[in-house]
Amino acid sequence: MEIRPAEISEILKKQIASFDTETDVAETGQVLSVGDGIARVFGLANVMAGEMVEFPNAGVQGMALNLENDNVGVVVFGDDKAIREGDTVTRTRRIVDVPVGKGLLGRVVDALGNPIDGKGPIEATERRLVETKAPGIIPRKSVHEPMQTGVKSIDALIPIGRGQRELVIGDRQTGKTAIIVDTFINQKPLNAQDDESKKLYCIYVAVGQKRSTVAQLVRTLEENGAMEYSIVIAATASEPAPMQFLAPYTGCAMGEYFRDNGMHALIVYDDLSKQAVAYRQMSLLLRRPPGREAYPGDVFYLHSRLLERAAKMSDEFGAGSLTALPVIETQAGDISAYIPTNVISITDGQIFLETELFFKGIRPAVNVGNSVSRVGSAAQIKAMKQVAGKIKLDLAQYREMAAFAQFASDLDASTQKLLARGARLTELLKQPQFKPLPVEEQVVSIFVGTRGYLDEVPVNRIGDFEAQLISEMKARSPEILDSIRNDREIKKETETKLVDFVKSFASSFA
């Protein structure tokens, strides 16, 4: 056999030139035990709290939550059935982060930001940590711009502003999600404009809900053209507790992208009671000490650190906003339970929905007496302030009188008038689902009710009166609605035109 030294030396030179002197160091650990979505891992001495770790054999990821002397408690994001005792666990050296940006609009993703709608990969250029600090005091500004829901009873009586946190609370099947969907649909005209400062991007976080419910919601948004400016994050009932715990923070990180870039976003957490239950499950399995109702001691902090991230930013910080509408489900109308009282104390007000009102046919079933907005009329346009102040007073007096009227046999004329007006205003605030009203139409309809033009109309015809009045006004005097929309107030000449129009319509209504 002939030995060719030149050829051999050439091969050796190439080998030496391409030799990689860098060593790839991976810090690994071993699974001690696994079950119920929690893995105990030995090793990983330098792992960070909240760091993503990988289980290469099982193809799933997890997050390090409990850092103890001799082991690390890891919550598993996915199915833990493929994880075995003794499996290798590797550090990723990054805290849990998710894709953010406009590429997510119109998409349905899971709690880690992975697409689950079958529309291909997400086009996102930026990633953000799911857990970040809320803005401080200096970067914030008081809430002053209205966030129109399109629901008369809310926009008039419990106004919500951009950057506010308003709790939607009520028993199951009282129309909580219906109000949310109406609010999303109502943003369509604003999002059709080119002005970024007026647009409101919508984010819906479904925690612990049925998959069929989420699919139906997405279909409704698509049918009404609202999905193109919305993001849906789904951690459904069949997913492990860590995913349900993480989903609200994921949604919040996506919303903060809009807030920090001078845009406006609305985020809905539906619902935080299920997130608290998922967190309780994780905490108990991690052997953290239980507190009241077996919730861990930091369940208040779980929600406060999430909701504090919703804010209206000052002009120096881009003037963006993130508005939060957390949802809480009560048991038998008990708003004084542990989780409801926690979230009520964190938020800037609550919209309380009642089963009794729902079954009476008052829908949306908002209990105006128990609902409040701590931002108040600062979040209303001037036109709404002009008409809504009176309706609050009238309804409060009506509720008080209605309670006494049950026991009184003969009532004086003024009381009868007050009861008749109250019944008509209650009827006026009813609204069909998926039919949000523009603010100028709401103003006209409340103006008509508070000025007494409905006093002679039979209660069962109030809905017809309102619908016909608005359609007649659009056809014959659209300038009245245009004036209210553009000026954001009812000017003297507009009011005169409005009164004349309503009077002539009322006389011809039959």
From Swiss-Prot:
Phylogenetic classification of the source organism: Bacteria, Pseudomonadati, Pseudomonadota, Alphaproteobacteria, Acetobacterales
Subcellular location: Cell inner membrane
Site (Required for activity): 371
Keyword Nucleus applies: no
Major subcellular site: membrane
Function: Produces ATP from ADP in the presence of a proton gradient across the membrane. The alpha chain is a regulatory subunit.
The protein, known as: ATP synthase subunit alpha
Keyword line: ATP synthesis, ATP-binding, Cell inner membrane, Cell membrane, CF(1), Hydrogen ion transport, Ion transport, Membrane, Nucleotide-binding, Translocase, Transport
